[in-house]
């Protein structure tokens, strides 16, 4: 009987530990921890672009803002950047601005990436990850669509096709 009791006791302990680990894994990796939600005002920030110019989100009120959080080490980020560049000129004329927020990488690494893809939209580096933390961004890429009134319209996590980028830009294009 002693062996049987020990077996069930060990099995019970193992089950409790497994459930605890499973819950921890789920809450850390799958639960929506984003602080940015559709219908809320976008959090203001000021970051410098690669030319040293300050970009403040609040100053873009009146325009739709396509706020993309990315990293050079992120394959989906790398795939979506050419789509964003392709549509940037057309939608900039219609009142949509792209701001690509890099996740704290060295400026030289980011500049090489920008040069390789010929990106012309503003690229800023979130040194210290303050903006990423303020928006609760996990994982990369994440794109936040902000309308001309500074309100978050949509939060998209994951890569985007060219069609998705175009649909998202249409969604935040200011009304004429």
Curated annotation (Swiss-Prot):
**Which keywords has UniProt assigned to this entry?**
Cell membrane, Cytochrome c-type biogenesis, Disulfide bond, Membrane, Oxidoreductase, Redox-active center, Signal-anchor, Transmembrane, Transmembrane helix
- According to the record, the segments passing through the membrane are 11-30
- Tell me where in or outside the cell this protein is found: Cell membrane
Residue ranges occupied by any Thioredoxin domain in the UniProt entry:
36-176
Describe its membrane topology. Single-pass type II membrane protein
Pfam families, sorted: AhpC-TSA (PF00578)
UniProt pathway annotation: Protein modification; cytochrome c assembly
A GO BP entry:
cytochrome complex assembly
Q: Per the annotation, which location comes first and is thus the protein's main one?
A: membrane
GO CC annotations? plasma membrane
Q: Any keyword Cell membrane? A: yes
Task: Name a GO molecular-function annotation.
Answer: antioxidant activity
Query: According to the UniProt record, which cysteines are disulfide-bonded?
Result: 74-77
Presence of the UniProt keyword Transmembrane helix in the record: yes
Matching entries from InterPro entries are given as: AhpC/TSA (IPR000866), Thiol-dS_OxRdtase_ResA (IPR023555), Thioredoxin-like_sf (IPR036249), Thioredoxin_CS (IPR017937), Thioredoxin_domain (IPR013766), Thioredoxin_ResA/DsbE_sf (IPR050553)
Give the protein family: Belongs to the thioredoxin family. ResA subfamily.
**What exactly does this protein do?**
Thiol-disulfide oxidoreductase which is required in disulfide reduction during c-type cytochrome synthesis. May accept reducing equivalents from CcdA, leading to breakage of disulfide bonds in apocytochrome c; following this reduction heme can be covalently attached.
Q: Which NCBIfam families match?
A: PRK03147.1
The protein's name in its UniProt record: Thiol-disulfide oxidoreductase ResA
Annotated source species: Halalkalibacterium halodurans (strain ATCC BAA-125 / DSM 18197 / FERM 7344 / JCM 9153 / C-125)
């Amino acid at each position: 009987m002693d062996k049987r009791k020990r077996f069930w006791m060990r099995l019970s302990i193992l089950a409790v530990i497994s459930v605890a680990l499973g819950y921890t894994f789920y809450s850390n990796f799958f639960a929506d921890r984003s602080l940015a939600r559709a219908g809320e005002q976008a959090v203001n920030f000021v970051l410098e672009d690669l030319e040293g110019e300050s970009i403040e989100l609040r100053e873009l009120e009146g325009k739709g803002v396509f706020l993309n959080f990315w990293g050079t080490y992120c394959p989906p980020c790398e795939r979506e950047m050419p789509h964003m560049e392709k549509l940037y000129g057309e939608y900039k004329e219609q009142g949509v601005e792209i701001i690509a927020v890099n996740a704290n990488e060295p400026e030289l690494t980011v500049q090489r990436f920008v040069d390789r893809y010929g990106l012309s939209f503003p690229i800023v580096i979130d040194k210290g990850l303050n903006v990423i933390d303020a928006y609760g961004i996990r994982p990369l890429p994440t794109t936040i669509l902000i309308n001309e009134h500074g309100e978050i319209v949509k939060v998209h996590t994951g890569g985007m096709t060219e069609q998705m980028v175009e649909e998202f830009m249409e969604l935040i294009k200011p009304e004429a």
